[in-house]
Amino acid sequence: MRVTVLGAGDAFSSGGRRQSGYLVETQGKGLLLDCGTTTLLALKALGIPAERIDLIAISHLHGDHFGGLSFLFLEYIYEHPRTKPLLIAGPPGTEERVRALHSAMYRELAARGVPFPVSFYEFAPEQKETLDGVEFFPFRVPHQEKDISLGYRVRTDGKAILYSGDCGWNEGLITHSQGTDLFICECCYFSTQTNFHVSYPQIAEQRHRLGCKRLILSHIGREVLERMTEVAIECAYDGLVIDL
């Protein structure tokens, strides 16, 4: 399994980092975890064909996590015409929001539809599901007041990955990290404490309780970048490749 970090930054692209996107590749299968607005840019900068993506799993419906979908659609329509199916999964409301996004950005194009099969699947939190050969356990995390945000424990090709999405610190991260090969955890803040994002001191304090073989911090915010000399946990960067 290979995981490529397409974007390790926050919504503000702090430090010039791209927005969230992680390509998980196994034997003949490509899973994209989140699709921030810079995802297509990242793929092209890294020389990765967009057609490698078979399945997209969105953690929550904020622009820096799903706003790049319209640009992928354009790529698949004009630059590298796609014929194979594309499955887009996410929390409740995903299909409606993706269609609204595409219509807002390219109304006439959206009205014509795309010339390849697109299907949607909306996860029910805490219910295991297998999509296109990939096993998901989606769990709700604290990030939005009303809309559902998800973290994912993903298992495929004999490996397990935990992806926090955006969230405040919660016990689910401890529970679902047990026995995983990789945990990609958001770390937006250093000194700021909120219920909606993880701060570095929080995860440093809880590190010993995590059951992952490898922990990588991502969604790095300005506060963390300004104090990187104090960070003792591995941090993601745009273009990082992780072989498991």
Predicted segments — roles?
Residues T37-T38, P142-E145, C167-N170, G221-E223:
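Short beta->alpha connector loops
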Residues G168-L244:
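Cap/insert and terminal regions of metallo-dependent hydrolase folds
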Residues P91, G165, S218:
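Glycine- and other small-residue-rich loops at beta-strand/loop junctions that grip anionic moieties
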Residues M1-L162, M228-L244:
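Binuclear metal-dependent hydrolase catalytic cores
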